[in-house]
Amino acid sequence: MAIRITFTYSTHVARNLVGTRVGPGGYCFESLVRPRFFSHKRDFDRSPRNRPASMYGSIARELIGEGSQSPLVMGLISILKSTTGHESSTMNVLGVSSFKASSIIPFLQGSKWIKNPPVIDDVDKGGTVCDDDDDKESRNGGSGWVNKLLSVCSEDAKAAFTAVTVSILFRSALAEPKSIPSTSMYPTLDKGDRVMAEKVSYFFRKPEVSDIVIFKAPPILLEYPEYGYSSNDVFIKRIVASEGDWVEVRDGKLFVNDIVQEEDFVLEPMSYEMEPMFVPKGYVFVLGDNRNKSFDSHNWGPLPIENIVGRSVFRYWPPSKVSDTIYHDQAITRGPVAVS
């Protein structure tokens, strides 16, 4: 009888200790006992008033569409925004802000993604004819490591990967986002696609054939006001020949140094003819992949290398077409240059 009374009393005392929460000891006891023995889970406040404003930043607007409800990706974007804020007091010598523990909370919250990403600098303005053809799959970059990675990932993983990559580079001087307003590079890049252009590689090497480059309007277009171009206009095209090459178009095919080029990224055979043209030193020859709907070197001649501002390396929009834009099949046939 005494043992039963003692056990009952001890149980009563334990319950009082748990329920009273007097002093720090009460909190400590509860934090240790409840999770282990009662499997109690705290509910975070899901009130919209407590959602951080960083959840609705420019990166989230840029990357995610209206339909996604993923708490994982939403929390990731929130953390990235919170760590790339404008509070100079949190920046260290490497330019990376300190991590905030409170930014983990959005991982447990749900919200609607914001529609209509902000407008980014357009490339290939003006002279290229826009043609709303039926959608076809891009034949470029299919063997890239980005494509291999994303092919086995879920939609959440794709969105998260895109968010991390673009948010890191978005404010960097090493890269710049660009928007495609025409179909001159179709089927590789379609109207409405958005790419990340890196600005580093050409400090260490020359532009190469098959590179997709973003460049300022060539000088010849600025000399004639009737073209309607200014120094602020930029284009996006693919390099098909480099300095010292001879370029020619005949029978719907491109010839470089009198060797026909087998290009699997071109939409269709060319409907125009072009006499042999020499590419001088310090220049490259650029064409759009949609050869018959592109305003390029076959119209205005070789492009000065100094006008190139970057190389397209990554398409981050739309999310369903996230991929690199680097051409991986380097089996483009090039013949010797004739010297006389």
Curated annotation (Swiss-Prot):
- BP GO terms, sorted: signal peptide processing
**Segment annotated as transit peptide:** 1-52
Tagged with keyword Calcium: no
EC number annotated for this UniProt entry? 3.4.21.89
Paired cysteines (S-S):
none
Query: Topology versus the membrane, per the UniProt entry?
Result: Single-pass membrane protein
Recorded catalytic reaction(s): these are: Cleavage of hydrophobic, N-terminal signal or leader sequences from secreted and periplasmic proteins
Where does this one sit in the cell? Plastid, Chloroplast thylakoid membrane
Q: Name the enzyme's class.
A: hydrolase
* Example GO molecular function: serine-type endopeptidase activity
UniProt topological domain (Lumenal, thylakoid) ranges: 176-340
Top-level taxon of the source organism: Eukaryota
Q: Name one GO cellular component term.
A: chloroplast thylakoid membrane
Main localisation, per the record?
plastid
- Bilayer-crossing residues are 155-175
Q: Which UniProt keywords apply?
A: Chloroplast, Hydrolase, Membrane, Plastid, Protease, Thylakoid, Transit peptide, Transmembrane, Transmembrane helix
Q: Which Pfam families match?
A: Peptidase_S26 (PF10502)
Which residues does UniProt mark as catalytic?
A: 184
- Protein function: Cleaves the thylakoid-transfer domain from a chloroplast protein.
**NCBIfam families reported in the protein's UniProt record:** sigpep_I_bact
Q: Which family does it belong to?
A: Belongs to the peptidase S26 family.
Q: What is the official name of this protein in its record?
A: Thylakoidal processing peptidase 1, chloroplastic
Q: Which organism is it from?
A: Arabidopsis thaliana
Q: What gene, per UniProt, encodes this protein?
A: TPP1
